[in-house]
């Protein structure tokens, strides 16, 4: 299973959250503390926005199939970047020759001209049976943008297709509604084909101004074919968050600094620190939405109505 990290708030040290914390995103790729039976060796990707930069609406984008732990370019860039919004992802695939490992399959996905980026931690079982049913729900101009072979890129195109303007800048409510609409379509197509195998769909989406994240699974716990059941399939795919003033590194380790007024939100597949006292688990079948206005973070947790 993949690992994902998303952030919205005060400028954050990219090297810190990717490489330096106890359970940094890159460390999770080879030495996770949760769902530790699965290694994420199929590449790294990120989109990072900085409101202080030129063309702040356009994120810095990086993708590489190189193992991120040994990626000197990524380490060098991470030491220099302090984004105000971020989605980063390490990709995990089953270790078979059937998997396609390449740049076109790396998350986050962001079509040319689109404002929304998406990363997915999960797996739609029997996706090959679903793929072409989704064509009727995806706008043709978006379907033509799909370059890879993943279920995740189709989910992304499906979300964009449910926005009034796929190339506009949706607010948190518009993006959350489009995400829920996409999940409903997936449920409908699964039912059409009689697919009822457990399929997690943890998503992180952002425009650089708003952030939406889901912790969700279709038919959790149902595996009709136990011969192909993996140990990593058993737990509900995790997602955690911490909110406060800013994420800091001090003498006693990393933490989200307390603040009377929230300014920053950090979401990750697992807490980035051994001390998880400042972290909360995103409820199952829930969504977090966040918007940052005038240096104040507005966020809420919603039940997913799918």
Predicted regions and their residues:
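N-terminal segments that mediate ammonia production and transfer
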Residues: 1-306
């Amino acid at each position: 299973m993949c690992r994902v990290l998303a952030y919205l708030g005060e400028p954050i040290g990219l090297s810190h959250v990717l490489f330096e914390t106890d359970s940094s995103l890159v460390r999770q790729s080879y030495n996770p503390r949760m769902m530790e039976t699965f290694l994420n060796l199929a590449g790294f990707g990120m989109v990072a926005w900085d409101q202080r930069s030129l063309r702040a609406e356009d994120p810095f984008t990086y993708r590489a199939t190189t193992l991120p732990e040994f990626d000197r370019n990524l380490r060098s860039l991470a030491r220099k970047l302090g984004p105000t919004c971020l989605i980063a992802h390490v990709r995990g695939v089953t270790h078979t020759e059937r998997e396609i490992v390449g740049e076109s399959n790396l998350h986050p996905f962001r079509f040319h001209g689109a404002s929304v980026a998406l990363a997915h931690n999960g797996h739609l079982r029997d996706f090959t049976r679903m793929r072409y049913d989704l064509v009727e729900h995806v706008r043709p101009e978006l379907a033509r943008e799909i370059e890879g072979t993943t279920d995740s890129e189709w989910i992304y195109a499906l979300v964009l297709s449910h926005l009034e303007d796929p190339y506009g800048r949706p607010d948190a409510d518009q993006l959350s509604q489009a995400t829920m609409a996409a999940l409903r379509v997936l449920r409908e197509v699964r039912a059409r084909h009689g697919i009822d195998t457990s399929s997690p769909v943890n998503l992180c989406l952002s425009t650089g101004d708003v952030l939406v994240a889901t912790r969700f699974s279709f038919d959790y716990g149902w595996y009709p074919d136990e011969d192909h059941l993996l140990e990593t399939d058993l737990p509900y795919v995790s997602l955690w968050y911490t909110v406060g003033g800013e994420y800091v590194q001090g003498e006693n380790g990393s933490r989200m600094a307390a603040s009377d007024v929230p300014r920053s939100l950090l979401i990750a597949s697992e807490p980035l620190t051994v001390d998880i006292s400042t972290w909360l688990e995103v409820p199952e079948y829930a969504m977090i939405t966040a918007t940052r206005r005038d240096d104040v973070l507005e966020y809420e947790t919603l039940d997913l109505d799918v």
